[in-house]
Structures are given as C-alpha cells and as structure tokens.
From Swiss-Prot:
Binding site for heme c 1: 25, 28-29
GO BP terms: electron transport chain; heme transport
Post-translational events: Binds 2 heme c groups covalently per subunit.
Protein name per the record: Cytochrome c4
Domain Cytochrome c span(s) in chain numbering: 12-90, 99-191
Classification via PROSITE patterns: CYTC
Record keyword Electron transport present: yes
InterPro entries: Cyt_c-like_dom (IPR009056), Cyt_c-like_dom_sf (IPR036909), Cyt_C_IC (IPR008168), Cytochrome_c4-like (IPR024167), Cytochrome_c_Oxidase_Subunit (IPR050597)
Any one cellular-component term (Gene Ontology): periplasmic space
Residues engaged in binding heme c 2: 120, 123-124
Keywords carried by this UniProt record: Electron transport, Heme, Iron, Metal-binding, Periplasm, Repeat, Transport
Length: 192
C-alpha cells in the first residue's frame, strides 16, 4: 500500500443519540422527534445527513435564537448520534386541509411554469418522503404545515440562507403566500 488509509466513515450511535435527545431535544422536538408544537420541526425519519448539516450549520454560522445555543455545546459525535437516532424514528403523520392540499400537490409535483416556480419533487422526491440524503435535501412528508410555511417564508425573505447555491431562496422567492400555504398543507398530510 501507499501508507494512506481511508478515513473511517463517521457513524452515529442511535442509543447514545436517544439519551442525548431525551435530555436536550425532547422539550421542543417531542417524543421520538415528533414535535407537538407546529412551529418546531419534526425530526423523526429525517435523513441523518440533513440533521448533521443543520446542526453543524447552527454550530458554525446559522444564527437562530433557539437552536444556536442548543447546538453549540454538542460534540461532532453527539451530532452524529442524534442524527442516527432521529433517522430511525417513525414519523407521526398530520392532517391537511383537503382543498389547500390538492392545490399544494399540483405545485409540489409540477411547479408553476407561469411564475418559474420549480417542482418541489425534483429535489425532494415524488411524494416528499424521499428527499436526497447525499445532497442533504430533507424529507418533507408529514412535516408541520406551520413549520414548513415559516421556513419557506424565511427562505423567501432571505432570513434563512443555509441552502446550497441559494436554491431554496430562489425557488421560494417566486412563491405566493397562497402557494406557500397550499404546499405546506400538502406536505403535512403526506404519511410516507
């Protein structure tokens, strides 16, 4: 060999993550990562890569009144452990307003060519349940509509800017308030 060894993959321990989650994250993100408060995200079933990205962003550069102080003291291993734990937890689906969800489904699947809104499904998967783990695009199914709405509004107003190459800011800038409400309801009602 040439004397170089490949770096060992960084892997989280779900059991250690559960202990940390129950001590630090439970109050806001709920049992098993299913937040009971609609403005706080559900973490259950999320890609571990996405959770790691978000926690590291909070630790390094993303200012957030609630999350930055919670993430700062976490070690890199604790971040991996939390991500591994939440990724294995089942999501609790929500109910959606049927009329809004129908409009949101169309926008999610096909976008709005008239205003240049891209289809959400292009990055987040055909039913919101897949996302793309390697690209760190999140799973969106069963997420609280209030949280999704707030997130899209923050991207639209450039209050949130941790999206690669401004992808979400660009897409959200083209969304109307009605479209944000509709796609948020659609995603909340998905159970995958």
């Amino acid at each position: 060999t040439d004397g170089h060894q490949a770096a060992a993959p960084q892997v989280g321990d779900p059991q250690a993550g559960e202990a940390k989650a129950n001590g630090v994250c439970l109050a806001c993100h709920g049992p098993q990562g299913n937040s009971l408060v609609p403005i706080w995200p559900k973490l259950a079933g999320q890609h571990p890569e996405y959770i790691v990205k978000q926690l590291m962003d909070f630790k390094q550069r993303r200012a957030n009144e609630q999350m930055t102080p919670m993430a700062m003291p976490l070690t890199d291993q604790e971040v991996l452990d939390l991500a591994a734990y939440y990724a294995t937890q089942p999501k609790t689906p929500g109910a959606a307003d049927p009329e809004l969800a129908s409009k949101g489904e169309s926008l999610y699947r096909w976008g709005n060519p008239e205003t240049g809104v891209p289809a959400c499904s292009g990055c987040h998967g055909p039913a919101g349940g897949a996302g793309q783990s390697l690209a760190k695009f999140p799973r969106l199914s069963a997420q609280h509509a209030d949280y999704t709405k707030q997130t899209l509004e923050h991207f639209r107003g450039a209050l949130r800017a941790n999206d690669p190459n401004g992808m979400m800011r660009g897409a959200a800038a083209r969304l109307s308030d009605q479209e944000i409400a509709a796609v948020s309801q659609y995603l909340q009602g998905l159970s995958q």
